[in-house]
């Protein structure tokens, strides 16, 4: 027998932002037994000695007091360092462009936090993510959030049946302007707080400065694939495939873009033109595959895929190589497919799962210059 809301304990992860504040408010209004948890994943004292986590936690305290729910802070710094930040540095060291948000959701928010919540007697965990969970045909499905502009299933692609069975996304049916309005109407302390952007542990800091604290920069040559030297780069880790800004190449003609990396010789490859053929791939090998249903649909199937967060859906055919690897054949060549990033699969609104981009091909030839 299903429990009534007031008998159902929901532990919600609260960041001190407007989204998780409204998610907590909605759960409370729906009658659930709600506990707010602030996750401290990073020691983020800035140059002025101000710890933004302290400010965020103070906002959580204020909102929880306004809503009338208990709150706690939990420190996951060690798990975060071991599972997310170490991966982040390893990928950059290997010349790739990682996606720490995907790893954070997999290892921290829906693993360490979920385990902690269950220890607190939780029936469910909740977050302020823009996504939906539906139980259909005997399994849990993850659907895109109604707000196309804010949908976050791309970052949640590694969640499993077990995790989804214990997860609530109260904002999934709402759009951002509605959430701001609800926060305002309820007089929540976070109603006008601006959204956080970028990688959580970098915050407002300069990316180059931050990364150089952990990985020594190794400047090198910037050249075309044919060997024409165009300048110097500050370190391969500071550049991603398709990047235009920060190259410092002047002159006439089309703008210059980073098109590849040679890790062995520490060369950044560049070329001209947004639609330069060197930036396009039509086949991908991806590893670390995770399926929301815990299994692939078939050995080969058609669906759509996103190769980065802010991207239209692309029609693809997915071929299962083994339980950890897929081959993705794109209907049309796609620009700036980047090793290390997530590729996420969809069937309409349903997120099927995702994987990590490993190798990129064009017309059957591996693009070795991608690093």
Curated annotation (Swiss-Prot):
Gene3D superfamilies: Adenine nucleotide alpha hydrolases-like domains, HUPs, Translation factors. Its EC number is 2.8.1.13. The active site is at residues 104, 200. Residues 150-152, 308-309 are annotated as: Interaction with tRNA. Disulfide bonds join 104-200. ATP binds at residues 13-20, 39, 128. Residues 99-101 are annotated as: Interaction with target base in tRNA. Pfam families: tRNA_Me_trans, tRNA_Me_trans_C, tRNA_Me_trans_M. InterPro entries: MnmA-like, MnmA-like_C, MnmA-like_central, MnmA-like_central_sf, Rossmann-like_a/b/a_fold. The keyword Kinase does not apply. Coiled coil: none annotated. Signal peptide: none annotated. Keywords: ATP-binding, Cytoplasm, Disulfide bond, Nucleotide-binding, RNA-binding, Transferase, tRNA processing, tRNA-binding. One of its GO terms (cellular component) is cytoplasm. Belongs to the MnmA/TRMU family. Catalyzes the 2-thiolation of uridine at the wobble position (U34) of tRNA, leading to the formation of s(2)U34. This is tRNA-specific 2-thiouridylase MnmA. It comes from Bacillus cereus (strain ATCC 10987 / NRS 248). The gene is mnmA.
